[in-house]
A protein has these predicted regions:
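Conserved active-site alpha-helix within GNAT-family acetyltransferase domains
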Residues: 106-110, 116-134
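A short, internal acetyl-CoA/4′-phosphopantetheine-binding micro-motif in the GNAT/acyltransferase core
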Residues: 78-88, 213-222
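Conserved G/P- and acidic residue-centered "switch" motifs that form tight phosphate/ATP-binding loops
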Residues: 53, 83, 91
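C-terminal functional modules
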Residues: 227-248
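Short hydrophobic/aromatic beta-strand element in the GNAT-like acyltransferase core
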Residues: 44-48, 58, 80, 190-195, ...
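Conserved acetyl-CoA pyrophosphate-binding loop and the N-cap/start of the following alpha-helix
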Residues: 87-99, 109, 221-225
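Amide-forming acyltransferase catalytic core, primarily the GNAT-like/NAT-type
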Residues: 128-223
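Short amphipathic alpha-helix that is part of the acyltransferase structural core
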Residues: 1-63, 70-77, 142-179, 210-212
Length: 248
């Protein structure tokens, strides 16, 4: 049977899921659980290549709306790049990436973003760009700066009122990614949402003292106070290691 590159069909979702689990070595059900916002878009965004009736390669091309002040830029986010471990070296990944780039050009996406090995993706025109800051915060430095823990409460991320308020606050950011599946993002394993003091905090981790800060938004500039908000952070010790906002 001739190899073909095309978009995933609805009845192939489970086959793709098993394929990605084998390629990445992740547990069963990992991708729908941890990327619930991407999975509904699979038939529109997942390019696959099939050989002998089986999926042997995949590249996801997911549309992103980047908002920078008054400007909106449509970009293509690349994810789930994988080739069958037994079929590597046959050019499947290159063929899929070239097809993805062609689709993005047809959709007039001026920008594409991915996370991965620079040398691997430089061949397709990708290059390291922008600035990334690593901030190491601790309780002592925040307290010395005059930050006091904000008065917040943990809320139910599945509550429609909570979702609406988080979306409203997120929309105040000058630079942001528009999120079409915000409610699904908040259902990922271990996600906790805290609100108060005119802002919100999203963390991952279910044990007290083991929370990983994912995102803090405060239109009034009180991010440090929100960062100190929970007893769990205080008991976690000195280091609070925030993850990049792009992780949500």
């Amino acid at each position: 049977m001739q190899e073909e590159i095309r978009l995933l069909k609805g009845e192939e979702r489970e086959e793709l899921e098993r394929f990605l689990e084998r390629a990445y070595g992740h547990g069963r059900g990992f991708f729908p659980r941890n990327y619930p916002n991407l999975w509904p878009q699979a038939t529109e965004c997942s390019l696959i290549i099939k050989s002998q009736g089986e999926i042997v390669g995949h590249v996801g091309t997911y549309p992103l709306k980047l908002v920078i002040g008054p400007t909106t830029i449509l970009a293509g986010a690349i994810g789930g790049v994988a080739a069958d471990p037994k079929a590597r070296g046959r050019g499947y990944m290159s063929s899929l990436m070239e097809s993805s780039l062609q689709i993005m050009a047809e959709k007039k996406m001026p920008l594409s973003v991915l996370w991965g090995d620079r040398q691997r993706y430089n061949h397709f025109g990708y290059e390291t760009c922008g600035q990334k800051y690593y901030l190491e915060l601790n309780r002592r430095s925040l307290e010395r700066a005059g930050a006091k823990p904000a008065d917040v409460r943990e809320v139910d991320p599945e509550d429609p009122a909570v979702l609406a308020e988080v979306q409203r606050l997120h929309s105040t950011l000058i630079c942001r990614v528009e999120r079409n599946f915000f409610q699904l993002l908040l259902t990922r394993p271990g996600v906790r949402v805290f609100m108060g003091d005119g802002g919100y905090l999203i963390s991952r981790g279910e044990y007290s003292g083991d929370l990983v800060l994912q995102e803090v938004v405060s239109p009034t500039g009180r991010e440090p106070e929100l960062g100190l908000c929970t007893e769990g952070f205080i008991r976690a010790g000195d280091n609070l290691n925030p993850c990049p906002k792009a992780s949500l």
